[in-house]
């Protein structure tokens, strides 16, 4: 995927409360190709927003971060795959049986609907978590990069197609996982934007150089007075 155009690498999150707000943002970003639908919008609208995106021929990152027992994971991924989404998140810490069940469910659901199966992405360590929180609150003694590497390797061994990780962990994943393993990176902020509430951030250009396949860029675009101009500005940062 190294030949992807800049605009195809940028995923814009629809972090809005309802369909009307989602449509407004989508239509203000005609050049954006990939949109993320997270928990807030999906719980509020169900599949309606997915249908709207498909009608506009946009790609969909369904970011539900599923985490449950294997049978439930299989069923949820089977149902999600029927919508024809491109990326779907599951928690890497759900364990190997759940990861394998999720992959099987996604393949079965897509086949039943006659669509391509989504690439499942294992969520490793949330970018809002610091090393101190991981150690003190979650009692995980591993350093963040080592823990991410372990979770990503395990996910790929279970047939999962990619992972979500912060930019700083991209370097260790270059050797830990195959070249085909998709790396989706939030915690990306252009040089002209503030870091916000994410602890481990990097510029778009730095993240791509470190091995990211896709970048999730939210508030620098969506909160801008002119989202289309901000989107173009991020694209220009990625264009040599």
UniProtKB/Swiss-Prot annotation:
One of its GO terms (biological process) is 'de novo' UMP biosynthetic process. Its EC number is 4.1.1.23. Coiled coil: none annotated. GO terms for molecular function: orotidine-5'-phosphate decarboxylase activity. CDD domains: OMP_decarboxylase_like. InterPro entries: Aldolase_TIM (IPR013785), OMPdecase (IPR014732), OMPdecase_AS (IPR018089), OMPdecase_bac (IPR047596), OMPdeCOase_dom (IPR001754), RibuloseP-bd_barrel (IPR011060). Pathway: Pyrimidine metabolism; UMP biosynthesis via de novo pathway; UMP from orotate: step 2/2. The active site is at residue 65. It is an enzyme of class 4 (lyase). Keywords: Decarboxylase, Lyase, Pyrimidine biosynthesis. Substrate binds at residues 15, 36, 63-72, 127, 189, 198, 218-219. It catalyses: orotidine 5'-phosphate + H(+) = UMP + CO2. PANTHER family: OROTIDINE 5'-PHOSPHATE DECARBOXYLASE (PTHR32119:SF2). HAMAP family: OMPdecase_type1_B. This is Orotidine 5'-phosphate decarboxylase.
């Amino acid at each position: 995927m190294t030949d992807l155009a800049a605009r195809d690498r940028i995923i814009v999150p629809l972090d809005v409360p309802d369909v009307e707000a989602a449509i407004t943002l989508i239509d203000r970003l005609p050049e954006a190709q990939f949109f993320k639908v997270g928990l807030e919008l999906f719980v509020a609208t169900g599949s309606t927003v997915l249908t709207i995106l498909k009608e506009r021929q946009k790609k969909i990152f369904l970011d539900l971060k599923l985490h449950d027992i294997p049978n439930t994971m299989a069923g949820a991924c089977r149902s999600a795959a029927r919508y024809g989404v491109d990326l779907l998140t599951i928690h890497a810490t759900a364990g190997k049986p759940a990861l394998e069940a999720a992959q099987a469910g996604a393949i079965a659901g897509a086949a039943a609907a006659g669509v391509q199966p989504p690439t499942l992405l294992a969520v490793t360590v949330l970018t809002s978590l610091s090393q101190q929180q991981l150690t003190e609150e979650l009692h995980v003694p591993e350093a963040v990069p080592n823990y991410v590497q372990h979770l990503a390797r395990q996910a790929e061994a279970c047939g999962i197609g990619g992972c979500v990780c912060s930019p700083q962990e991209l370097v260790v994943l270059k050797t830990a996982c195959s070249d085909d393993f998709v790396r989706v990176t939030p915690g990306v902020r252009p040089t002209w934007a503030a870091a916000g509430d994410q602890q481990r951030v990097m510029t778009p250009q730095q993240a791509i150089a470190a091995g990211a396949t896709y970048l999730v860029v939210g508030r620098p675009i969506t909160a801008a007075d002119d989202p289309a101009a901000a989107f173009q500005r991020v694209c220009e940062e990625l264009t040599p």
